[in-house]
């Protein structure tokens, strides 16, 4: 096994010279940036509003970002993490992180369901334009994703969470039109976009393209 591409943009790394680095362990998820950014904004959100819809959306975004961190590193600071993103707190096991995320997603859906037809300001939502039902679908789909990922480790909990997600009245993603996608350029890019932004695989000496895709979304 080995690497198929440099971890950094610009093709200026050492992989092409068969000198692998450990950059994939820090560039792929950028947990040093995700955690402080998520929790700093999460704190600010709670300071400026008590709207249950907006706060539920914030919880969904937090889970969407943080589950990738725990899937990469296993134990992470989560339930006791400071709102400033401090890492100087005890780590939670991945089992405890997943259980906390299930509770947060359930609470978010519970808060959003009574407001499913009451869309909020479109200019406050760069992903779904204020469409509350889309956020419910995202929460259910994240719940289903997490359930599938523990199907061997905790089959009973996996079954319970998966069935709960798909049986919700709003349901889960059924097409790419449901995807949570945020297009951004310049300095406002997602710190993990380098992992998915160039989805082209070439093999053989003639550079034949085996697969080609673009972008990533939930």
Pin down the residues of each PLM region.
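Structured, solvent-exposed acidic/aromatic patches
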Residues: 6-218
């Amino acid at each position: 096994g080995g690497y198929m591409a440099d971890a950094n943009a610009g093709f200026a790394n050492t992989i092409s010279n068969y000198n692998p680095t450990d950059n994939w362990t820090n560039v792929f998820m950028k947990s040093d940036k995700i955690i402080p950014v998520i929790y700093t904004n999460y704190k600010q959100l709670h300071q400026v509003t008590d709207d249950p819809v907006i706060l539920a959306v914030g919880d969904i975004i937090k889970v969407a970002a943080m589950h990738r961190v725990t899937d990469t590193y296993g134990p992470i600071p989560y339930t006791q993490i400071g709102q400033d993103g401090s890492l100087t707190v005890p780590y939670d096991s991945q089992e405890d992180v997943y259980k906390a995320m299930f509770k947060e997603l359930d609470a978010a859906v519970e808060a959003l369901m009574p407001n499913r037809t009451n869309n909020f300001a479109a200019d406050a939502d760069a992903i779904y334009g204020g469409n509350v039902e889309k956020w419910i679908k995202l929460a259910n789909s994240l719940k289903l994703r997490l359930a599938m990922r523990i199907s061997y480790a905790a089959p009973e909990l996996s079954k319970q969470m998966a069935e709960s997600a798909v049986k919700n009245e709003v349901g889960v993603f059924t097409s790419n039109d449901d995807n949570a996608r945020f297009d951004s350029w310049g300095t406002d890019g997602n710190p993990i976009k380098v992992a998915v932004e160039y989805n082209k695989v070439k093999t053989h000496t003639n550079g034949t393209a085996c697969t080609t895709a673009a972008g990533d979304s939930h």
